[in-house]
């Protein structure tokens, strides 16, 4: 009986972990707050509106766009993308900052997050093509604008992967991205399961096989490092040295893949996606220099 239980557990655990990763349960979704959007627009001296597109596979994706009073003169636009389990709400502080500096700022709910449909989160496999649809939308509001991107964690990794096909980005800022989804999973499984790190590899192998057989997803193709290796778009990598969710070594690997077109800023004392909290002024100055150079 013990042996049967172990076998069942060995089969069930990768399936459970895969389903949890691919589906953000309704109770875990962060719902956008229109009142907060109104507040941010007022503080930034901007107008705002609902944004909506359909993805290539028919998913209804939602967001907000903030248009500053100077947007016609500035000709600058930025797409802001949150991390896993968050929503556009988590990027509103950045929207305010960019709107105050004359950028049209688009904050979106990534597929499977907030109120965007999905139905599944794929960590870049499908999301990278969503970025092209969002770029089309934003540039339809601001024809000829210079387009930029800023993402956090999963959002950072999606933006890097989007550079495979989306050539209109002038530059991108990516905080705490993963080099590959396999590497990200390897770091998280011991924390999620309490199992020793040595168990991560076989669990990931089984989980990735399940994702391929059940949904047709090749999660090994989620590889920001390969996208960065190929791109000519400048990418500023930011990583907190106290990050306990995504090891700073992942950003180092990304930078090493294409040092000619990337720069790495490591922030002492900053935890996961907390660089703008620990070093706010320097964060803002570096990002603006990166976009405007």
Range-by-range predicted roles:
Residues 244-250:
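Conserved alpha/beta-hydrolase "acid-adjacent" motif
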């Amino acid at each position: 009986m013990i042996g049967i239980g172990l076998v069942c557990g060995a089969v069930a655990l990768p399936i459970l972990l895969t389903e949890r990763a691919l589906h953000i349960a309704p109770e875990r979704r962060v719902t956008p707050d229109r009142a907060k959007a109104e507040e941010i627009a007022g503080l930034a001296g901007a107008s705002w509106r609902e944004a909506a597109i359909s993805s290539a596979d028919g998913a209804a994706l939602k967001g907000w766009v903030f248009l500053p009073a100077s947007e016609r003169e500035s000709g600058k636009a930025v797409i802001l993308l949150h991390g896993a389990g968050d929503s556009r709400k988590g990027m509103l502080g950045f929207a305010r900052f960019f709107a105050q500096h004359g950028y049209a700022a688009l904050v979106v709910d990534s597929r499977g997050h907030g109120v965007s449909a999905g139905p599944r989160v794929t960590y870049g496999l499908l999301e990278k093509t969503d970025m092209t649809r969002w770029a089309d939308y934003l540039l339809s509001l601001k024809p000829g604008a210079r387009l930029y991107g800023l993402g956090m964690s999963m959002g950072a990794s999606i933006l890097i992967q989007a550079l495979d096909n989306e050539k209109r980005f002038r530059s991108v800022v990516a905080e705490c991205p993963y080099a590959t989804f396999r590497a990200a999973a390897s770091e998280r499984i011991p924390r999620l399961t309490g199992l020793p790190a040595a168990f991560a590899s076989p669990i990931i192998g089984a989980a990735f096989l399940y994702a391929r057989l059940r949904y047709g997803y090749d999660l090994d193709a989620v590889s920001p490092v390969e996208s960065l290796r190929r791109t000519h778009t400048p990418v500023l990598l930011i990583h907190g040295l106290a990050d306990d969710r995504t090891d700073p070594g992942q950003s180092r690997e990304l930078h090493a893949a294409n040092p000619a077109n990337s720069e790495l800023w490591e922030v002492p004392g900053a935890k996961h996606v907390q660089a703008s909290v620990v070093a706010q002024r320097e964060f803002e100055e570096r990002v603006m220099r990166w976009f405007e150079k």
